[in-house]
């Protein structure tokens, strides 16, 4: 099937690669998406709607930004995702990009749980968790090792 996108033009997508979010993303009615992985933005991917050319989210595997991050699916969530014992569930976080890479944030309070075996996903809202919608992608240690100097507002300037 061909998918029209505003970012990548028309692309060919195998039906088997389409991810269904039965409940959609929060605030959006679209339910069918595909993960696009342009080589120039590793480790980030695009979660592109196959129904709306303009709707796409930058996402990242939560392992890339929070090594201790874990989510316990409820029985209802597991059922919606058709997760059986031993099935892999990939957790993706929606990314907010910034002109200064050290200001990139990820939404760890509303991860997307993906069952890659069934190509089913669900955005989950973690209530009462320590995670936020604006978790820094880079930790403080990475920021302090970055070349250049930081001004009072935290922006990097030439060394």
Swiss-Prot record:
Keywords: Bacterial flagellum biogenesis, Chaperone, Cytoplasm, Translation regulation. It is found in: Cytoplasm. GO terms for biological process: bacterial-type flagellum assembly; regulation of translation. It holds the Pfam family FliW. Belongs to the FliW family. The gene is fliW. InterPro entries: Flagellar_assembly_factor_FliW (IPR003775), Flagellar_assmbl_FliW_dom_sf (IPR024046). Acts as an anti-CsrA protein, binds CsrA and prevents it from repressing translation of its target genes, one of which is flagellin. Binds to flagellin and participates in the assembly of the flagellum. Disulfide bonds: none annotated. It comes from the Bacteria. GO terms for cellular component: cytoplasm. Interacts with translational regulator CsrA and flagellin(s). This is Flagellar assembly factor FliW.
């Amino acid at each position: 099937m061909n998918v029209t996108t505003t970012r990548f033009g028309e692309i060919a997508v195998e039906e088997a690669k389409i991810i269904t979010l039965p409940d959609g993303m929060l605030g959006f009615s679209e339910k069918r998406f595909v993960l696009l992985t342009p080589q120039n933005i590793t480790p980030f991917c695009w979660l592109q709607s196959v129904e709306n050319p303009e709707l796409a989210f930058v996402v990242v595997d939560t392992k890339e930004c929070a090594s201790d991050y874990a989510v316990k699916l409820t029985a209802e969530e597991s059922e919606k995702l058709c997760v059986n014992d031993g099935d892999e569930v990939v957790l993706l976080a929606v990314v907010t990009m910034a002109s200064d890479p050290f200001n990139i944030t990820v939404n760890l309070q509303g991860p997307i749980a993906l069952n890659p075996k069934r190509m089913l996903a669900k955005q989950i809202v973690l209530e009462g968790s320590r995670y936020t919608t604006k978790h820094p992608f880079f930790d403080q240690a990475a920021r302090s090792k970055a070349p250049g100097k930081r001004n009072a507002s935290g922006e990097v300037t030439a060394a």
